[in-house]
Amino acid sequence: MNKKLNIAIIGQKFMGRAHSNGWKQAQNFFSLNAEPVLKVACGRNETELKKFADRWGWSEISSDWKSVIERDDIDIVDIATPTHLHHEMVIHAAKHGKHIFCEKPFALNLAEAESMLKAVNSSNTVNYLNHNYRRCPAIVLAKKMISEGKLGTIYHLRSTYQQDWLADPNAPMGWQ
């Protein structure tokens, strides 16, 4: 594997840690055509960011995500920030020709999602939205039943996903 892909991550809290671990472990699970390189970690608190970078193996840190996206040596921008920040970051990354790995939910509303999609489609880049529950057995079964027409025409869908960590009233509700 000779090709290397330089990654910049924006966000070093919970999802940033989860994504960093994923990038580090990917080669242990998949045959990759390129090696992910943990190049730059972006965040607001430089003291925390330095600890994060040291812990997960990021080469550099920055508190200026826009300038990092604009760098020529960055191939992929991993957006692991709260949802209300995704719109501006995705559009900026697409505008600068970066491939995008974005945490869910993608956008706050349909209008934001459509403008983000338009930016990605006009940029010759790939946007990957992290749908990590798509392999859950219940989701796979529901998709199969819909695809096979077993549920008829679907006009509306409302679902919930029961997380056991929500059963603990002392569990923190923030995901950052």
Where are these regions (language model features)?
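N-terminal Rossmann-like dinucleotide-binding module
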Residues: 1-56
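Alpha-helical structural signal in soluble globular domains
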Residues: 22-29, 52-55, 91-92, 96, ...
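Core-facing hydrophobic residues within beta-strands of well-ordered domains
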Residues: 36-38, 74, 154
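Beta-loop-alpha module in the N-terminal Rossmann-like domain of NAD(P)-dependent dehydrogenases
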Residues: 45-47, 55-119
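Hydrophobic residues in well-ordered beta-strands that form the structural core
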Residues: 102, 127-129
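Predominantly a Rossmann-like dinucleotide-binding segment in NAD(P)-dependent oxidoreductases
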Residues: 125, 133-176
